[in-house]
Every structure is written in C-alpha cells, then in structure tokens.
C-alpha cells in the first residue's frame, strides 16, 4: 500500500511540473462587449518574469473596438488613462516613456493576439496593481487586479 501511495505521489509531482511552469503566465481575452475574461491575476513571487497573453476574441477593428492590457499601480490608473487618450491610437493610447506603466501589450483588433513579459521584481508585496484597457472609455469596464502572492 505504501508503495502505491508513494508511486501515486511521484506521478502527481511529474504531472504538476508543467502546471507550475504555467503559473508564470496567464491567458486573458478581451471581447467586443468591452470585457476581460479575468478580473484578477495572481503572480507568484517565485516567478522571475511573468507573461500576459492577450487575445481579442471579437471581430471589430482596433480603431473601433481595440483592446490592450496595461499594468499600473492602482493609484496611477486614471492619470495613465487620461494621458493615453492624448497620445492616441498610434501610441497604443499610452504616453511615450510613461514610467507609471509597468507593462503593456499593443492595441489589438478582433482576432489579434499579443504578449508582454515583465520582470516580477517591478512588483512590491502589499502594493495595489490594476490592469486595464487604455482604449478611450474602456477602462471603466475592462479592468482587474493583479496581486503578488507567495
């Protein structure tokens, strides 16, 4: 019996390895209804880097219903959105060189995908982070929290 339990544990450990590796990335989708399919993302402190894979699952073009994924401290979100509107679509609705932006994808149209990888060292335990779409008017609905966890 002990050998069976031990063997089962070894088998579970072998199958969990890919799952553990996948914890340093997340897939997230944005729709034509101005929604992300996730409202919260947890990033393990054990990750050196974290990757966000964004897919726009809608059909509308980027100039009509474009979506991106932007990460900032929660306190910076509104100012980043405001400055992004002035920057325009050609700049991904983000002010050039904005140090408040910790990571972002490009603005996507329906059917498009993009990824961004960032250093987890940019995040501090206890700080509040928000991810959102910076396309004008989208941030009110298309946002969520990102949290650094053990």
Swiss-Prot record:
Residues 1-21 form the signal peptide. CDD domains: Azurin (cd13922). One of its GO terms (molecular function) is electron transfer activity. Coiled coil: none annotated. Residues 22-150 form the Plastocyanin-like domain. Keywords: Copper, Disulfide bond, Electron transport, Metal-binding, Periplasm, Signal, Transport. Cu cation binds at residues 67, 133, 138, 142. GO terms for cellular component: periplasmic space. It is found in: Periplasm. Disulfide bonds join 24-47. Pfam families: Copper-bind. Gene3D superfamilies: Cupredoxins - blue copper proteins. It comes from the Bacteria. PROSITE patterns: COPPER_BLUE. InterPro entries: Azurin, BlueCu_1, BlueCu_1_BS, Cu-binding_ET, Cupredoxin. NCBIfam families: azurin. This is Azurin. It comes from Bordetella pertussis (strain Tohama I / ATCC BAA-589 / NCTC 13251).
